[in-house]
Regions:
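Sec-dependent bacterial lipoprotein signal peptides
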Residues: 1-14
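N-terminal targeting sequences that direct proteins away from the cytosol to non-cytosolic compartments
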Residues: 16-72, 111, 120-123, 148-152, ...
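Glycine-centered tight beta-turn/hairpin loop motif at sheet-sheet or coil-to-beta transitions
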Residues: 46-48, 77-82, 135-137, 151
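A short acidic-to-branched-hydrophobic micro-motif
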Residues: 68-99
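Surface-exposed aromatic
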Residues: 81-85, 127, 155
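Solvent-exposed loop/turn segments at secondary-structure junctions
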Residues: 90-92, 133-136, 162-164
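Short amphipathic alpha-helical segments
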Residues: 96-97, 101, 168-172
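Signature of long, low-cysteine stretches enriched in small and polar/charged residues
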Residues: 99-151
Length: 184
């Protein structure tokens, strides 16, 4: 009887202790038609990171700024939907403060949802931003990766046009995120 009571207590404890808010957005994604098996690995101009693109039709665009480097790829599907993946690297100074950064993002952008994504072996913050003034309107999934040792901030975003079924289009691009690699 004691063992039975102990089991009930443990089951109750673990079910209450589970963080239901940390559900990964991509848990609901099914298969993707973005095939990277014959893809092309592309790197940013300074060699901080790389990722796979499906083929040359995704037209990579690189940029280098004073403190940043970035790489964007994109394509338009046969039914007219926009698919864009961007990764950027920047150095930061001072101590990184997630709460302060999140408050700034929410102040500066139309954040419609926040969450977590499991990427590169860790849970990462996710901000879903609706750009209403764009034409067409777009929605972007921003994921932050902070390297406190090298004081580096990597921002990844998946963007598609806003409208019905945008979540499935974001899910289609999941393999692009998974192919992201940091080069130290």
């Amino acid at each position: 009887m004691r063992l039975f009571n102990l089991c009930i207590i443990l089951v109750t404890f673990f079910s209450c202790a589970m963080d239901k808010s940390s559900k990964d957005f991509f848990d609901n994604c099914t298969e993707s038609s973005v095939d990277l098996s014959n893809g092309i690995r592309v790197k940013d101009s300074l060699g901080y990171f790389s990722f796979m693109m499906p083929d040359s039709s995704w037209m990579p665009k690189r940029y280098v700024g004073e403190n940043t480097t970035g790489l964007t790829i994109g394509d338009v599907s046969s039914d007219g939907h926009l698919f864009v993946f961007n990764a950027s690297h920047a150095y930061y100074t001072g101590e990184w403060d997630w709460e302060k950064e999140q408050a700034n993002v929410e102040k500066d952008f139309n954040v419609v949802e926040t969450g977590k994504v499991h990427l590169l072996g860790q849970s990462r913050p996710l901000n879903i931003v609706h750009f209403q003034v764009d034409s067409p309107q777009t929605i972007s999934y921003y994921i932050s990766i902070i390297d406190t040792l090298n004081r580096s901030n990597y921002t990844l975003n998946l963007t598609t046009n806003y409208g019905e079924d945008y979540e499935s289009r974001i899910c289609e691009m999941k393999p692009l995120l998974e192919s992201f690699t940091i080069h130290l």
